[in-house]
C-alpha cells in the first residue's frame, strides 16, 4: 500500500470538487468520480472516450450501504453480498433514486460493488459516498493493473492518481444480474461461476452474448495495439513462425504444455500454469508485448472453467473485430 493517508485525503477532496481520481482495486485500477455528480460522471466518459450508453460500476464502502443505491435488495443479492464483499463481485439491481442516469447508461438498473483493496476502502470511507468508476484506461484498450499504466495512458486527464501497487486479481469483477429470481452472470471475472453456485446451491447461466447493460461487453475490448489471433494450442508455434516469416513482429502466449518448446518469434510470454497467476499477469503481458513492438499476438484460450472462464473472455474480446478508423 504505497498511498499515504494524506494522499487519500487529497483524493477524497478531488472527488468532492468534481474531479477524477484513479485508484487501485483488487481487480484493476478504476477511474473514479463522485457517483452523485452528473457532470463529474460525464467527464469520466469524456476522458475514456466511452460511449454514454455503457454503464459504470458504483463502488461503495460496505454491504451495509447497498440499500442506499438500489430500489430493493433481493434475498439472493443479500446472500451474495454477505459472502463475496469486499471482493471482485458486482451486483446489478434496480436503480435507486439517488443514482443519476448518467452513471447507468440510461438504464433502470445499477451496478454496485465493494472493492477488496485497503486504498480503495480507505478512499471510500474518507469520501463518504459512492464512486462511479470504470477501468482507468481509454475505452476498449487493455485495462491497467498498476498506477504507471494509468499515468502512461491517461496522463494529465486524471486529477489525482493513488498508487496502491499491482492489482492482486488482475481481471475485472464478475457481474451478476440479481434483478430476477434466478441470477445470471453477465460478465465472468474474479469470482468464478463455481464459487457462485456453491453459495447459491443451484446452477447459474453465463450467456454467450450480452446487450451493453454492463461494462466490457463490446465485441472488441481489453485490446492491445497489436492484433490478437486465436489458434488451438498445438498450432501456436506453427502459426507464430509462419507470421514471423511473413514479416510480422510476433508475440506469442506460449501455454504451459509447450513451455520448453523453442519458437522463432519477436517476443514470447510463458503463460503460467496457475489460473490465478495468469489472470494477475494477463493485462501486463499484453502491454509488454505492445511495448516490445509486436504487431501480432498469437494465443490460445485456456479451459473455460474457474478463473479460466474470465481469462478466455478477455482474450476472446481482445481478438474481437475492431471498429474501422
Please tell me what each predicted stretch does.
Residues 1-325:
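Active-site-adjacent structural elements in enzyme catalytic cores
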Amino acid at each position: 500500500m504505497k498511498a499515504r493517508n494524506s494522499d487519500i485525503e487529497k483524493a477524497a477532496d478531488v472527488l468532492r470538487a468534481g474531479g477524477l481520481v484513479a485508484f487501485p482495486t483488487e481487480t484493476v485500477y478504476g477511474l473514479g468520480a463522485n457517483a452523485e455528480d452528473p457532470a463529474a460522471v460525464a467527464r469520466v466518459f469524456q476522458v475514456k472516450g466511452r460511449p454514454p450508453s455503457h454503464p459504470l460500476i458504483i463502488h461503495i464502502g460496505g454491504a451495509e450501504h447497498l440499500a442506499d443505491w438500489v430500489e430493493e435488495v433481493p434475498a439472493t443479492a443479500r446472500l451474495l453480498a454477505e459472502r463475496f464483499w469486499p471482493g471482485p463481485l458486482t451486483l446489478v439491481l434496480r436503480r435507486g433514486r439517488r443514482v443519476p442516469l448518467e452513471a447507468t447508461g440510461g438504464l433502470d438498473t445499477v451496478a454496485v460493488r465493494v472493492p477488496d483493496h485497503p486504498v480503495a476502502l480507505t478512499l471510500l470511507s474518507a469520501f463518504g459516498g459512492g464512486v462511479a468508476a470504470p477501468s482507468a484506461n481509454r475505452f476498449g484498450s487493455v485495462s491497467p493493473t498498476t498506477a504507471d499504466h494509468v499515468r502512461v495512458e491517461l496522463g494529465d486527464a486524471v486529477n489525482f492518481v493513488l498508487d496502491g501497487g499491482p492489482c492482486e486479481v488482475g481481471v475485472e469483477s464478475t457481474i451478476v444480474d440479481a434483478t430476477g429470481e434466478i441470477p445470471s452472470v453477465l460478465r465472468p471475472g474474479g469470482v468464478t461461476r463455481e464459487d457462485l453456485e456453491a453459495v447459491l446451491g443451484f446452477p447459474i447461466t453465463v450467456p454467450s452474448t450480452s446487450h451493453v447493460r454492463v461494462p466490457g461487453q463490446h465485441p472488441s475490448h481489453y485490446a492491445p495495439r497489436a492484433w490478437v489471433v486465436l489458434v488451438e494450442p498445438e498450432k501456436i508455434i506453427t502459426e507464430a513462425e509462419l507470421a514471423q516469416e511473413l514479416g510480422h513482429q510476433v508475440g506469442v502466449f506460449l501455454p504451459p504444455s509447450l513451455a520448453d518448446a523453442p519458437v522463432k518469434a519477436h517476443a514470447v510470454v510463458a503463460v503460467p500454469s496457475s489460473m490465478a497467476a495468469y489472470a494477475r499477469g494477463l493485462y501486463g503481458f499484453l502491454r509488454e508485448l505492445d511495448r516490445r513492438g509486436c504487431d501480432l499476438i498469437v494465443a490460445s484460450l485456456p479451459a473455460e472453467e474457474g478463473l479460466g472462464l474470465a481469462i478466455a473472455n478477455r482474450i476472446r474480446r481482445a481478438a474481437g473485430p475492431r471498429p474501422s478508423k
